[in-house]
Amino acid sequence: MNIILNILNQFLKKGRSIVILKKIVRRFSKNNFDKNQYKNWLDSNKSSLDKFLKKINHRLFIETKKESLKINDYANNRLKNIKVKLGGGANDMLLYFFVRYFKPKVVLETGVAAGFSSLSILKALKKNKYGKLYSSDFPYFRIKNPENYIGILVDKKKFPNWELKIEGDEVNIPKLISNINHIDIFHYDSDKTYKGKINVYNLIKKKISNKSILIFDDVQDDKFFYEICQSSNLQYKIFKFKSKYIGVLGKIKSNEI
């Protein structure tokens, strides 16, 4: 009953009903592909993230490991008394390392939840003393007052270089990128459906180039990542993270990705 009331409350807020309906329709849309065959492709192309990062820059890898421990200890302590589920954290090591290594001017991410990915990116940007993070999210409409939990791990006073919008990707992204010339690093971790990923990719593709690094979480859910790999000239890398897979598109060094 509480879930229904929470959904209704969010549904009645301006602009939220259309986003919620689209999410529900996409969630129940059929996703026709051979999951076993696709998993075999992922497994045959996956790499060890630790080995990959060490090969690029061993000293930075050590720094990243230390920061990852700090981030996860802080997050676990911050979230242990919260009684709602806010979704799993992203691969903070990959995000922190890439931001430190590339020193991007612009990072765009979709999917914030508690803010694991946001905090990792922002800490790396702060270490770089350069760059801004633009984040897109939509409240978990099944819980009460979901806006209060978005980015709860991030102390906004410490990170003035963070711009967050919470009206859904289709509304947020055009606003976020309107004054951006180029997206240096893009991290996708929002709508898990094929249609949702295609929509976001179409929104950002004019702002990316072969110099951009694109990171997609949960690529095992559909063939979106595979199709992008096949249709673009970008090199790719796949990493297993817990029970899921992360896909990376872009060029780091010719012999490393």
Stretches with model-predicted labels:
Residues L21-K22, L60-L79, I173, I177, ...:
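Generic hydrophobic, helix-prone segments enriched in Leu/Val/Ile
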Residues K13-K14, K54-R59, K66-I71, K156, ...:
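Polar helix-capping/helix-linker motif
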Residues Q37-D50, K65-A75, G111, N148-D155, ...:
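Short charge-dense sequence patches
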Residues L12-V19, K30, N57, N77, ...:
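Short, flexible coil/linker elements and helix-boundary hinge sites characteristic
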Residues M1-R59:
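Membrane-proximal basic amphipathic "stem/tether" segments
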Residues N81-L86, D92-I257:
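S-adenosylmethionine/decaboxylated-SAM
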Residues K46-N91, F97-F102:
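Class I SAM-dependent transferase core
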